[in-house]
Amino acid sequence: MKKITIGFYSSRPLEDKRNWSGTMYKMYEQILKYGYEVVWVPIVQLSESQQKIYSFIEKSMQKIFNRGYNQHINLYKSLVLSNKLKNAITRQKIDILFAPTAVCELAFLKTDIPIIYLNDANIAQLLNYYPYYSGFGILSKRETLWLERKTLNNVDVAIFSSEWAVDFAKKNYRIPTEKIKLLKFGANLEVPEHLPSRRVIDGEYRFLFLAVNWERKRGTLAFETLKILKNKGYNVKLTIVGCEPNIQENWVEIIPFLNKNNPADLQKIQDFLLTSHFLFVPTEADCTPIVFCEASGYGLPIISTNTGGVSAHIENGKTGILLPKNATAEDYAHEIEKLLQHPEQILEKSQNARTKYEKELNWENWGNQFNDIIKNILSQ
């Protein structure tokens, strides 16, 4: 019996563990487990002459509207790239196309090959939410929304990683429920086989800030929160990994950068996850951060913000603390203090976080659900 061949559309080779912070590789790994043939479909790009045409359009739009223009998703690129992708998949003779994040390329793609699309958000949700999707003119916004709607209607299945994104696609784009699927991501590093046991030594509670964007992840808010608790007499320690803020306190440890692709650095990250009591990343804007899946795998209660798709990974009061976007350092300190006064609740949240990882936030679960989607497509 001939193997089903899945074309995986990606900017980098499928074996590259750096692609989308390792998420593309993890998905590729899971698809292979179910016995499918997986071939890389490299992303299609504008030619030099087409790029000149696009640059002219972009400059014209910026001049006319005196606003930014969405260089990622726009009508000209979509028309050109959809046609190029059609030619690419025709040459490769695939049975199913899996095209994560490819809004631009899928909008006008005409093919009899079933298409599975995946993203961690609707682009419409990111407009004026993420910096690189902000400041667009009205026509650019309308183009973006129109193309995204067209893509979602054109594909056979659209997968999202959070209820936040799924609900938006259904309500705002009116995409049929049966076409939209929720598949949560997993951890992109190895997690312990069992829930690690953590001891509190000399009453010290260790908080981990693991992120590369100090501003967007609001590292200052985490620092100010713990400073309040420190001034109240609590023995707290903050470990910052991935950033280098100008902070000089003996209770703050700063590790500027660790590379997950370097075995020694990866081991250090895992050690920090093993020895911390909380992950504290009060992010300003996020979809579904992989680090929250990883922290759950290590049984860390997570303290963050109820924004974007974050609640897909954290249940407020059960696996961690989720506060509104306008919450202050005092608000966070108040909620954390409740836990420090009742250590048994920290253990309970740790166990709940690990349970959530085992039931939802792991790649085996993702692979099983993805396989069901493929089987359903093939049966039609």
What feature does the model see in each segment?
Residues 338, 345-360, 366-372:
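A short, well-ordered alpha-helix in the C-terminal region of glycosyltransferases
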Residues 196-217, 222-227, 238:
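Conserved donor-binding/catalytic core segment of Leloir-type glycosyltransferases
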Residues 164, 186:
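Carbohydrate-associated surface elements
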Residues 316-317, 321-329, 338-343:
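Conserved acidic donor-binding segment of nucleotide-sugar-dependent glycosyltransferases
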Residues 284:
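Aromatic "clamp/platform" in nucleotide-sugar-dependent glycosyltransferases that forms part
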Residues 301-305, 314, 322:
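Short hydrophobic beta-strand element within catalytic cores of glycosyltransferases
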Residues 242-278:
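Nucleotide-activated donor-binding/catalytic signature segment of Leloir-type glycosyltransferases, i.e.
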Residues 64-68, 111-149:
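Acceptor-binding helix/loop patch of EC 2.4 sugar-transfer enzymes
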